[in-house]
Amino acid sequence: MPVKIPDHLPAAGILESENIFVMSETRAANQDIRPMKVLILNLMPNKIETETQLLRLLGNTPLQVDVDLLRIHDKESKHTSIDHMNTFYRDFEDVRHKNYDGLIITGAPLGQIDFEEVTYWDHIREIIDWSQQHVTSVLFLCWAAHAGLYHLYGLNRKILQQKRSGVFVHRRTCQHFPLLRGFDDEFFAPHSRFAEMDIEELKQHSELQVLAQSDEAGAYLVLSRNNRNLFVMGHPEYQKSTLNDEYHRDLAQGLNPNVPQNYYRNDDPKDDAIARWHSHGSLLVSNWLNYYVYQLTPYDLSDMSAVTPWESQ
């Protein structure tokens, strides 16, 4: 959250140059405050686990957040009861007429399937297109990040020979971005995917900017230049046991998976996993919610034309 300071205080320029969020008394006096409305499109098989992971991060901020859960279809989920889905989830037709401050689109276990071959691809495209007019900021996670970059910018991914699974060191490639406030120079984040984007293609795209990357895992944080779309190539929401659960699931299915890198103590699956990314995940979602949702969204959500770009603040 911002520090409110007197108008024209000399320290303001110094703090802003250090990427510290300060707000003048004049601007603070004109701020309206209300709960943030966030929609979550949950594409993961275990709906309840993913709900818990995302709500844990959203709940770790000073802002009040009202959450709606969205499903892609009304078919029964393999890992979640239809009663749960019917009770807590909405269909797109229920929210199509609404506007939201934020939208989170989760990953999905579809890493090796061409986007156009995904059975609900048309629904994904429709929701992404809708979000560009009805949502202040969209957070795309893992598979959804690849899908969003493909649909919005025509960028395709490369399928990997082996699943990339593990916890990798990342570094900031830009400095003075609100999203990166409080980030260490290097930080950890988990990945679990069968594909990757071409980082040079991302860097050369005029509408995108790469904010963080890994020597081992490639591009990690990519932001559209209009600040409306944030693409996160990993899984900062994962809890400590998730990569372990996925590894043993793949073993049971005879997929001969590689051991997740930098995850188990001594890289031995018989030892405990080490969670190195929770503080990063909390800070990432907090910064997104504060700087790219709360600070930019209109008080009156019926008027999305009032979304304030960063350069106007």
Swiss-Prot record:
It catalyses: L-homoserine + succinyl-CoA = O-succinyl-L-homoserine + CoA. GO terms for molecular function: homoserine O-acetyltransferase activity; homoserine O-succinyltransferase activity. GO terms for biological process: L-methionine biosynthetic process from homoserine via O-succinyl-L-homoserine and cystathionine. It is found in: Cytoplasm. The active site is at residues 142, 235, 237. The keyword Amino-acid biosynthesis applies. One of its GO terms (cellular component) is cytoplasm. It is an enzyme of class 2 (transferase). InterPro entries: Class_I_gatase-like, HST_MetA, MetA_family. Substrate binds at residues 163, 192, 249. Disulfide bonds: none annotated. Transfers a succinyl group from succinyl-CoA to L-homoserine, forming succinyl-L-homoserine. Belongs to the MetA family. NCBIfam families: metA. This is Homoserine O-succinyltransferase. It comes from Shewanella sp. (strain ANA-3). The gene is metAS.
